[in-house]
């Protein structure tokens, strides 16, 4: 690495925290003249090394404001999470690969904050022992950085005694309690959780919400009362809720999404046992993702392709080599223990709630013996109703609209590869992302509008001359609000034949489903459909 390049590099580690078993951090890095192509985190311990993939290219407008001359400053953010094979990690190094192929190592060991949890409670050790022999092995990390500062870092700690003395009296005096488990990563699952809590409170039911908090590597317990008020506590483990489950009038356990939970297989085993120990508490398992089937909860394999849940022997060879960032949200594991323990959890549920029939079919591929009478299909309610339909001109050059927060699994690389082809082949096509794109793309044919409100959609479509929509997701989404909104705009849509969106668009007359999952196929389908629509608008 040349001396000037090292000297001119700018970076910041906003937070890097470890609890001994897990690492999480975020920051930014950029150079005045050279683009950074890839970032990784190298861990060194006593007799071991590990390379963690880093999600690089996140939007950082704060960095761009302070360092406007740095190349790609606005997309210089990174986030990383993962599990060291053993404790402790003595050295942590950021590995940077530049666009010219050069490589630079930055020692960031000094930035690590340690959050040692001390000895675990005897009850937790028992649960860990029951799962002995396992090697425990997750839209989207997008939004963690944005929300991290809003987290309640100073929430008081709550051990088992405190749970009884401080929390239980208020819960035990009420008529009913719903205990909800969910991740804290944002997105549709969290929106659904908020609606669920509001419904329960409106019915006079108190709610205890347990989430995992990545920025601090611990759990949060939030207690909501129907009369109002909210209390927030830190807990070292979900096992701290056992006194509440044992003594409070728990009528419902609602498993929304445990993606990112510290010990996912221990959690699955524990939930099944809690349901057996408390038969009056109804257990609902909501399938917002495919976490119960695989740590790659978006069902993309180690090569980044949709897998469709193949034979478990294929999964056994895929999972050990899977390097995706979302898989790193879970500890290393094997597919056998994963399916066995999550299968037990699903079997214990009174209701396995799917939001599309596509989800039900895929889940049954992983668990063909799951009782059919316990699986429900309840699509989400979509409130979006446009005030009017957008006016579009199909005789004008093709302008492709992409709506939403487009991460890699939602098709960011498809958009990037399409733009590469458009630029390389000098095609008269523009792409407008109404929302955000999670990968940096430099093209004069691209415009990214940034965040939007639903009531702005029609105006943004018209102002940008959009005349065709693309839904580029490369994973089988369990439900898609964006797809429903696109249909209500009555615009032509191109998408891949995957998941709930594929099922929904197959019955929509203005949709075209691509022959294969690739940028080339998407672009060809868009061009073909645009030509057909343009021909229909030509005067006879």
Language-model segments: residues:
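Basic, ligand-binding patches in group-transfer machinery
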Residues: 1-170
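Membrane-proximal helix-turn-helix segments that form the acceptor-binding/catalytic region
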Residues: 308-352
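Conserved donor-binding/catalytic core segment of Leloir-type glycosyltransferases
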Residues: 353, 393-410, 419
């Amino acid at each position: 690495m040349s001396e000037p390049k090292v000297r001119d590099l700018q970076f910041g580690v906003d937070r890097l925290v470890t609890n001994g078993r897990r690492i999480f951090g975020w920051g930014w890095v950029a150079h005045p003249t050279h683009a950074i192509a890839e970032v990784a985190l190298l861990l060194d311990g006593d007799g071991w090394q590990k390379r963690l993939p880093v999600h690089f290219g996140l939007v950082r407008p704060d960095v761009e404001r302070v360092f406007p001359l740095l190349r790609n400053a606005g997309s210089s953010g990174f986030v990383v999470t993962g599990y060291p094979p053993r404790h402790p990690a003595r050295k942590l190094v950021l590995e940077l690969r530049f666009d010219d192929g050069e490589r630079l190592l930055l020692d960031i060991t000094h930035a690590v904050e340690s959050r040692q949890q001390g000895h675990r409670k005897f009850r937790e050790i028992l649960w860990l022992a029951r799962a002995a022999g396992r090697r425990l092995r997750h839209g989207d990390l997008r939004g963690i950085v944005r929300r991290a500062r809003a987290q309640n870092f100073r929430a008081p700690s709550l051990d088992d005694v405190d749970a009884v003395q401080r929390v239980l009296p208020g819960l035990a005096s009420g008529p009913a309690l719903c205990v909800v488990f969910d991740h804290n990563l944002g997105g549709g699952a969290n929106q659904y959780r908020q609606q669920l809590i509001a419904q329960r409170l409106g019915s006079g039911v108190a709610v205890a919400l347990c989430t995992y908090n990545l920025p601090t590597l611990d759990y949060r317990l939030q207690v909501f009362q129907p009369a109002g008020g909210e209390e927030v506590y830190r807990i070292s483990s979900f096992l701290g809720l056992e006194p509440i489950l044992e003594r409070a009038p728990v009528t419902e356990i609602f498993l929304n999404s445990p993606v990112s939970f510290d010990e996912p297989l221990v959690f699955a085993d524990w939930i099944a046992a809690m349901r057996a120990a408390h038969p009056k508490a109804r257990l609902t398992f909501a399938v917002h993702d495919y976490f119960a089937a695989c740590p790659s909860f978006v069902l993309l394999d180690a090569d980044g392709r949709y897998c469709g849940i193949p034979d478990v022997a294929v999964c056994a060879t895929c999972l050990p080599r899977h390097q995706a960032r979302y898989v790193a949200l879970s500890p290393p594991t094997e597919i056998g223990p994963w399916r066995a323990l999550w299968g037990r959890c699903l079997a214990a549920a009174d209701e396995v709630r799917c939001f599309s029939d596509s989800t039900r079919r895929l889940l049954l591929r992983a668990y063909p013996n799951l009782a059919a009478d316990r699986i429900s299909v309840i699509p989400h309610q979509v409130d979006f109703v446009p005030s009017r339909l957008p006016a579009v001109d199909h005789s004008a050059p093709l302008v492709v609209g992409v709506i939403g927060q487009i991460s890699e699994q939602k098709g960011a690389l498809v958009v990037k590869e399409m733009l590469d082809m458009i630029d390389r082949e000098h095609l008269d096509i523009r792409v407008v992302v109404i929302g955000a794109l999670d990968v940096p793309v430099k093209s004069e044919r691209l415009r990214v509008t940034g965040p939007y409100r639903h009531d702005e959609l029609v105006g943004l479509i018209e102002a940008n001359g959009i005349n065709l929509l693309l839904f580029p997701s490369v994973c089988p989404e369990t439900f898609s609000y964006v797809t429903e909104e696109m249909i209500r705009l009555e615009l032509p849509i191109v998408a891949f034949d995957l998941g709930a969106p594929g099922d929904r668009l197959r019955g929509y007359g203005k949709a075209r489903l691509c022959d294969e999952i690739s940028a080339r196929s998407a672009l060809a389908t868009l061009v073909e459909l645009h030509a057909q629509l343009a021909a229909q608008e030509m005067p006879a």
